[in-house]
A protein has these predicted regions:
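Short capping loops/turns at secondary-structure boundaries
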Residues: 111, 115, 131-134, 149-153, ...
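Enzymes that bind and transform nitrogen-containing heteroaromatic metabolites
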Residues: 3-31, 47, 87, 155-156, ...
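Zn2+-dependent cytidine deaminase-like catalytic core
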Residues: 38-137, 222, 248, 255, ...
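Proteins enriched for Cys/Gly/acidic motifs involved in redox and nucleic-acid/cofactor modification
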Residues: 26-28, 119, 133-161
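Short, flexible segments with low predicted structural confidence
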Residues: 33-34, 93-95, 162
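Generic structural signal for helix capping and beta-alpha/helix-loop junctions
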Residues: 112-113, 139, 305, 327
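N-terminal glycine-rich anion-binding loops that anchor highly charged ligand groups
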Residues: 28-42
Length: 375
């Protein structure tokens, strides 16, 4: 059995690998974020991370960076090494060829092409394998990837900002700004993190947003607009920039001239059936999953947020709370619609974390599974 000192060293090096993995945020999808650190005789001799989809995996980048021969060394990797050919050859092969004698793994890979096979191959070749080091942190790093690979649908995060009395705007509709600059910058990092960003036509008509990532060297998410009847103006900022920023309109409209107008501007138009008078969000998730969109930041208004909850497509809720009070009986709230009839039928949240960001607070919670049989 390993002593406390060795276990602590394992955690320390895995933490380094996690920090490396996070550098790939926003650029690896539909692949996971992965970091790797190679240690020999108590010294780090190589490190790497998966920088971008299609480029070197973390293990191969770490091996390529080694300052001395890795024979007899240990490699710390946040996710089980792959054992199949994709955009890159199997990392298991590279590890075996390198002479590394010990592999320390954070998360097992749920991908059915890997799922325990990489670990088994390593063990069959006499490699010492230690599993589940900082497993919780490594799992959380790739929660969107894990959900997508198991369900073939995007991992959906509902995000909204509100005052302490639960308002997302004043009674006049003014909403700039509910939260402070630090919280708004945090939102930009979320836009980088997730592959897509989704809003409803109501938000587009009210705010004419861009829904882009404003971080330096950031990557714009794929913009997804739920617009049943294609009411978004062709001179809106989203449509006018669709030729340079990937933009999808989900609609049930059969008006071929309207559809052509959007497509001529560079938009992709998805034909999605209606359900209860709105876009069928479950069908939309299937279509987006097939298009390799593995995660979505939902920045909808109250109507779309309600539809998303009612449809059971939301896995996480991010609530930014500003220390302000707007009041107003008619001031909008984050989730509207008809609502649930009683407390027993409410959507339940779990594993809530509270983070202070400047003067504001972020409460991040997971949606508890199977509350309504479809969440």
């Amino acid at each position: 059995m390993k002593d406390i000192t060795d276990m602590e060293k394992d955690r320390q090096y895995m933490k380094m690998a996690l920090e490396l993995a996070q550098k790939g945020m926003g650029f690896t999808a539909p692949n996971p974020m992965v970091g790797a650190v190679i240690v020999k005789s108590g010294k780090v001799i190589g490190q790497g991370y998966h920088r971008k989809y299609g480029e070197l995996h973390a293990e191969r980048e770490a091996l390529a960076s080694c300052t001395e021969q890795p024979e007899g060394a240990s490699i710390y990797v946040t996710l089980e090494p792959c054992c199949h050919y994709g955009k890159q050859p199997p990392c298991v092969n590279a590890i075996l060829e390198s002479g590394i004698r010990r592999v320390i793994i954070g998360s097992s890979d749920p991908n059915p092409l890997v799922s325990g096979k990489g670990i088994r191959i390593l063990k069959e070749h006499g490699i010492e394998v230690t599993e589940n080091v900082l497993k919780e942190e490594c799992d959380k790093l790739n929660e969107a990837f894990f959900y997508y690979i198991q369900n073939q649908k995007p991992y959906v995060v509902m995000k909204y900002a509100m005052t302490m009395d639960g308002k997302i705007a004043t009674y006049t509709g003014a909403s700039r700004w509910v939260t402070g600059e630090a919280a708004r910058m945090h939102v930009q990092k979320q836009r980088l993190k997730y592959t897509g960003i989704m809003a409803g036509v109501g938000t587009v008509l009210a705010d004419d947003p861009m829904l882009t990532c404003r971080l330096e060297n950031g990557r714009n998410p794929v913009r997804i607009i739920c617009d049943s009847h294609l009411r978004t103006p062709l001179n809106s900022r989203i449509v006018k920039t669709a030729s340079t920023i990937p933009t999808i309109f989900a609609t049930s409209s059969k008006d071929q001239q309207k559809i052509k107008n959007y497509e001529d501007m560079g938009c992709k138009v998805l034909d999605v059936p209606e359900k209860n008078g709105h876009i069928d969000l479950n069908r939309l998730m299937e279509l987006l999953g097939a298009a390799k969109i593995d995660s979505i930041l939902l920045e909808g208004g109250g109507t779309l947020n309600w539809s998303a909850l009612e449809s059971g497509i939301v896995q996480k809720v991010q609530t930014y709370i500003a220390p302000k009070l707007f009041g107003g009986e008619s001031a909008k709230t984050p989730i509207e619609g008809k609502g649930f009839p009683d407390p027993a039928s409410a959507v339940l949240l779990k594993n809530s974390e509270i983070i202070r960001i400047g003067d504001d607070f972020l409460i991040e919670s997971e949606v508890k599974s199977n509350v309504h049989g479809n969440c």
